[in-house]
Amino acid sequence: MDGPNSDRAHDRHAFDRVAACKARIQHNTAELAERFRTGTPVADLIRERTAFIDHLLSEAWDRRIGRGATDVALVAVGGYGRGELLLHSDVDLLILLDEAAPSSRKQDLSDFLRLLWDIGLKPGHSVRSPAECAEAARTDQTIITNLLEGRLLVGSAALWEAVRSETAPERMWSSAAFFEAKMAEQRIRYSKYHNTAYNLEPNVKEGPGGLRDIQLIGWIIRRHSDARGLQDLVAHGWLTDAEYRELKEAQAFLWRIRFALHALTGRCEDRLLFDYQRELAGLFGYRGETSNEVVEGFMQDYFRTVTGVERLNELLLQLFNEAVLHRDDAFSPTPVNDHFQAVNDYLEAVHPAVFREHPLALLEVFLILQKNSALEGVRAATIRLIRQHIHLIDDAFRNDPEACRLFMDILRQPGGVTHQLRRMNRYGVLAAYLPEFGRVVGRMQYDLFHVYTVDEHTLFVVRNLRRFALEEFQQENPLCYELFQLIEKPELLYIAALMHDIAKGSDGDHSEVGERIAEEFCRRHRIGPRETLLVKWLVRHHLVMSMTAQRKDLSDPEVIHEFAQIVRNQNTLNHLYLLTVADIRATNPSLWNSWKGALLQELYTSTSWTLRRGLDTPPDYAEQISAAKDEARTLLQRFGLAEDAITAVWENIGDDYFLRFLPEEIAWHTTAIAACRPEHLPLVLLRPESLRGSVEVFIYERNRDFLFAQTTAVLDQLGLTVLDAKIIASRQGFALLSFNVLERSGTAPEGLFRLVQICDRLKEALSGGGAPPPAVSRLATRQIRHFTVPTKVFFHDDPQNRFSILELIATDRPGLLSKVGQAFMRTGIRLHNAKISTVGSRAEDIFFITDREDRPLDGEADRAALRRVLIEFVGDQ
């Protein structure tokens, strides 16, 4: 007779079986991970993992359902059904249940699923009858796709066959309807990744050019025919042998990365995050002089791989579109010229030997597309021919005057320049025609600043320049639109854009090397001497305007005069301004903001005025101070402020103040200070609509220790980014502090609640006296922690000998400016001005400083002491 002891023995036996199954899974996972590290091909490991889970599920089924059951079936679907199970992939199951099955069967299935959870499989599952499957699949493309890859594991074959019959293309989701749905799905998926494969932390599975692109090809062809794998695509004439090999190699590479991510993280991780890139690069055997070079080499191979997958995905889907959706359509070719014809609004070579017999047609095809806006693209067979004949673009081709003429014609067209350069890049023609460009295709820079590969960034620069020409985008940057109308030969700007980063990754300064490449390009393309000089100059100096605007004091007339001497004339300034704005906006769209736009426009306007005045006329400080006072006084009188009130404020402020602020800002400050009683200090005001493309925070307070450090600590805690800081000490012991700030999103703070919150928090903190600032509790982002920058301090001389210019390079982190302020206070340093710049994870800040007596730090001992304290406070984190 059974009793409590018997029940406990049964429970212990069941527990032991569960524990044993868990141990088997863990052992299999560890064994496959180890074999992966020792070089076993990933395809073998995936097959073995799939077979192992198949066997495990069959055992569990036998225990809970019984192999002889005819009213139920277990089907693997999704990636598992496809036989592509990685270490931590989802185990997706469909359980088919006969409508006539006894009610007890549902309990059996519940026990079966509970067992799977107990042993750690965590399956995704659905339980349906064949009729329910068909009904659900009729309106849900995800379900029909899963069923398409279904694989019977155990149970009733008749039930599974009924599902296959009920969901056949004749009954639902014809191959044409399925194709259109999958194309729409891919467009949505691509948009989630900004329609580019070139993301710094790409998704290996879902991103453009990832494994999902390969799977989508298989789904569409399988719905249309009896093809089961990629190999069948060759037999059915969809792929050539070479394309099949390229696709298989890409799949193996992406599988390898995804398998490594699963092994490394112990979970289903498909994102190639910064956290893993360096480790995977080492694991895959990449080498380089620096750790960054190792990662960049690995990621360049990744980006080139996914670009190839994207290209093959596009080719195959277009082939399918032509062969299936338009199979019965009668389109008569329309001749375009001797080499091409139009078929259904797509360009097609008139015969397969066109490119072999007329190699220049490899460039001509893109020019024809530009000149015929009704053409939607190139037919798939012709794309394939282009790829097969790229080897014809050799040195003789590149030096052929007719080839050079065709390429320049492409750049000179009034429309389609960006589209066709992108198409040339996709098909591999641009890299073949410009081999130096080919070396930067897929090349990333391992930082948070450059969010695109070099080739993608370059084509975005061209796109931005093209937008400046179009009235529909005039409001994006009115000055750029206005200036572009003055450009006589826009193609020179496009050439400079193509060349400005073409030498990235080469030995030496990429601007200097790029200048030499640009000179050779101009010689080969018969560009005139004057135009060649302009292109060379733009490539060599493409960074000078952004560096000046973001790192130097634009209120200093000498800075403007020096920049004007570099530029020399208005035409060069116009070209450089357009190239600079296009370049910055194409580097990292999230880092472009109204502040940077205002800085560049201020530099452009000031330089234009200096050029009109004449480079031989030295800056006149007294004249500019007098002009600023006159304009500000006119505004103040309009506001009704008495002359004696104006004088009372201004006589306590040095002349330097009138150089560093605009007349409108001077008038605003003066009005506020004149109305402020001492008992109301600290005075904290916000100007939401600053002339500098940001919110200005103005503080008037008694000068004391930690004032800058306290203020920046509070601004940091409030989630504000400081872009610029000016500190003026009055003759009566007061300090005027002006900060230009934006939200971390790059937008200006707005809304009454937010503006009042900023003022109140600052007043509260500054009313507490001269105590050291509180520690900033905000944490650094996950990404920044992977890009530490060694702290470096440099000193530069001020041409006017008013300040010492301190340059701090460090890892950007919460509370950085507050720590700098504390270091200045410790060493008796007076801060007058600060230019704050963040390049990804790298802070590049410029401080204009003096000692307590307002003298520059000339002595090496003083500079060394300050450097030592700064590094102590800022440190390397």
Curated annotation (Swiss-Prot):
InterPro entries: ACT-like_dom_sf (IPR045865), ACT_dom (IPR002912), HD/PDEase_dom (IPR003607), HD_domain (IPR006674), NT_sf (IPR043519), PII_UdlTrfase/GS_AdlTrfase (IPR013546), Polymerase_NTP_transf_dom (IPR002934), UTase/UR (IPR010043)
Enzyme Commission designation: 2.7.7.59, 3.1.4.-
Keywords tagged on the record: Hydrolase, Magnesium, Multifunctional enzyme, Nitrogen fixation, Nucleotidyltransferase, Repeat, Transferase
Catalytic activity: [protein-PII]-L-tyrosine + UTP = [protein-PII]-uridylyl-L-tyrosine + diphosphate; [protein-PII]-uridylyl-L-tyrosine + H2O = [protein-PII]-L-tyrosine + UMP + H(+)
GO MF term list: [protein-PII] uridylyltransferase activity; phosphoric diester hydrolase activity
Short name of one Pfam family: NTP_transf_2
Domain ACT: 696-778, 805-877
Free-text comment about domains: Has four distinct domains: an N-terminal nucleotidyltransferase (NT) domain responsible for UTase activity, a central HD domain that encodes UR activity, and two C-terminal ACT domains that seem to have a role in glutamine sensing.
NCBIfam families documented for this protein: UTase_glnD
Annotated function: Modifies, by uridylylation and deuridylylation, the PII regulatory proteins (GlnB and homologs), in response to the nitrogen status of the cell that GlnD senses through the glutamine level. Under low glutamine levels, catalyzes the conversion of the PII proteins and UTP to PII-UMP and PPi, while under higher glutamine levels, GlnD hydrolyzes PII-UMP to PII and UMP (deuridylylation). Thus, controls uridylylation state and activity of the PII proteins, and plays an important role in the regulation of nitrogen fixation and metabolism.
Protein name per the record: Bifunctional uridylyltransferase/uridylyl-removing enzyme
